[in-house]
Every structure is written in C-alpha cells, then in structure tokens.
C-alpha cells in the first residue's frame, strides 16, 4: 500500500496503544515503554518497537526529552499533536499541569512507571487508573478528592 509522502497510517493495534501509554506515563524511558507494550502483548520484537517509536517521533507524535534521565536512557513524552490524535480517538485527557516544566517531575513519573511495572510483573495489579484519567474524571461530578498520580 502506498501513502502520500509525509503522511502515515496509525495502526489501531500497535501505534495507538503505544501513544496511549506515553500519554498516560507522562515521561517514560524507551525500556519502560517497551516493557509496557510487551506486558500488554502489543509488541514482541524490540526491533519492531524501536522502528515504531522512531516513526512516531519522526512524525511529531512523540517527543524525545534529552537530558532528563541519568545514564543512557532515552526519555519520551507525548507531543501536543500526539495528544490531539488520542483525544480525537476518544482518549480522556484534560491536560497535565507542570509536567513540562520541572526536571524533578520527570524523575517522579519514571519512578511511578517502575512501581506500575513492578506491580504488573508480580501480578498484584488488578487495575491502574492513570493520572490523565483521574484529572479528566475530576472535571465531572464523579470526582476524586484531588488529582492523584494514579489509583491502584
């Protein structure tokens, strides 16, 4: 199948879940993102995953965030265009405060991802409600007491 130069077709089975995970994670390393996709059984090949991430970065749906993590880990976050694609697809997202301004918030989100992954790997996790969904729900009458980072 041929596509017009500069355009891309998003896979509902592979691209959308990856974009959703980046959005819900706030900040996420490449290794964390691959582990989420592997645990969701949407990606089994690291090579295919890396190609998918490069393609989504190249089209401006995911942003690389250099210098935010120590070591050699690449950190990613959702771009405004990526969030817009997901909102158009029905994703709940009311925005996120202070996520783009403070380096410390990056470390916080990366640690939260590690907690999420550890609970998932141990099979102790029944349901994880991400901050994006909590903040969106808090705009309705069915609200939490505050904007939590996650509800387990």
Question: Which sequence ranges carry the predicted segments?
Answer:
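Nuclease-adjacent, charged terminal/linker segments that flank catalytic cores
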Residues: 1-99
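Amphipathic alpha-helical segments that form well-ordered structural scaffolds
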Residues: 32, 114-118
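Intrinsically disordered, low-complexity segments enriched in polar/charged small residues
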Residues: 37, 113-114
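Active-site metal-binding core of divalent-cation-utilizing nuclease and nuclease-like domains
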Residues: 65-66, 104-106, 118-152
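Generic beta-strand structural signal
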Residues: 74, 113, 146-149
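A short, highly charged nucleic-acid-interacting micro-segment common to nuclease
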Residues: 96-113
């Amino acid at each position: 199948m041929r596509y017009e130069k500069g355009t891309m077709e998003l896979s509902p089975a592979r691209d959308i879940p990856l974009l959703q995970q980046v959005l819900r994670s706030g900040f996420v390393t490449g290794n964390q993102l691959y582990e989420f996709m592997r645990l969701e059984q949407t990606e089994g090949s690291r090579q295919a995953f890396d190609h998918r991430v490069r393609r989504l970065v190249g089209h401006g749906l995911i942003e690389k965030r250099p210098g935010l993590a120590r070591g050699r880990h690449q950190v990613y976050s959702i771009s405004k265009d990526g969030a817009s694609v997901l909102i158009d697809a029905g994703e709940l997202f009311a925005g996120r405060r202070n996520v783009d301004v403070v380096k410390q918030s990056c470390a916080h989100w990366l640690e939260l991802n590690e907690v999420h992954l550890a609970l998932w790997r141990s099979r102790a996790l029944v349901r994880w409600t991400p901050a994006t969904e909590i903040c969106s729900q808090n705009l309705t009458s069915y609200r939490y007491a505050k904007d939590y980072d996650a509800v387990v």
